[in-house]
């Protein structure tokens, strides 16, 4: 499994990649593997400000539906439109083309509370 060191992670298996004033959010390689084949991504929070740990959408696999949680507080600037026709991108490229949302950070200090790649690996090894 792949856990890029330049990302931060949550205990709920989301990742965040900060690029200047914006950040991209997705689910981890571990999470997509546990969910199995992703068939639908439902995110209706574009344009809204969502608090840390609140639900920003759902992701549907063949066997289950899971909530998606905000890793930090922020405004949802964009939803990955490619996932509408190709939700399998989450399975194929969880940290690249399979990103879920682009956000503007409300409180960058919340990033310090997230897990490093090393700490996330320890979490899922339990």
From Swiss-Prot:
Record GO biological process: glycine decarboxylation via glycine cleavage system
Lipoyl-binding domain: residues covered: 22-104
Cross-referenced InterPro entries: 2-oxoA_DH_lipoyl-BS (IPR003016), Biotin_lipoyl (IPR000089), GCV_H (IPR002930), GCV_H/Fam206 (IPR033753), GCV_H_sub (IPR017453), Single_hybrid_motif (IPR011053)
NCBIfam families per UniProt: gcvH, PRK01202.1
Protein task: The glycine cleavage system catalyzes the degradation of glycine. The H protein shuttles the methylamine group of glycine from the P protein to the T protein.
Family: Belongs to the GcvH family.
Protein name: Glycine cleavage system H protein
Organism whose genome encodes this protein: Parabacteroides distasonis (strain ATCC 8503 / DSM 20701 / CIP 104284 / JCM 5825 / NCTC 11152)
Lineage: Bacteria, Pseudomonadati, Bacteroidota, Bacteroidia, Bacteroidales
The encoding gene: gcvH
């Amino acid at each position: 499994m792949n856990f890029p060191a330049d990302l931060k992670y949550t205990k709920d298996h989301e990742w965040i990649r900060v690029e200047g004033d914006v950040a991209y959010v997705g689910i981890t390689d571990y999470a997509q593997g546990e969910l199995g084949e992703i068939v639908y991504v439902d995110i209706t929070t574009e344009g809204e400000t969502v608090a840390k740990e609140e639900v920003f959408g759902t992701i549907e696999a063949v066997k289950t539906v899971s909530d998606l949680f905000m890793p930090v507080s922020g405004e949802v600037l964009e939803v990955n439109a490619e996932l509408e026709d190709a939700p399998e991108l989450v399975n194929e490229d969880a940290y690249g083309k399979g990103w879920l949302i682009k956000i503007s950070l409300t409180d960058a200090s919340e990033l310090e509370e997230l897990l490093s790649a090393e700490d996330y690996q320890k979490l899922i090894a339990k």
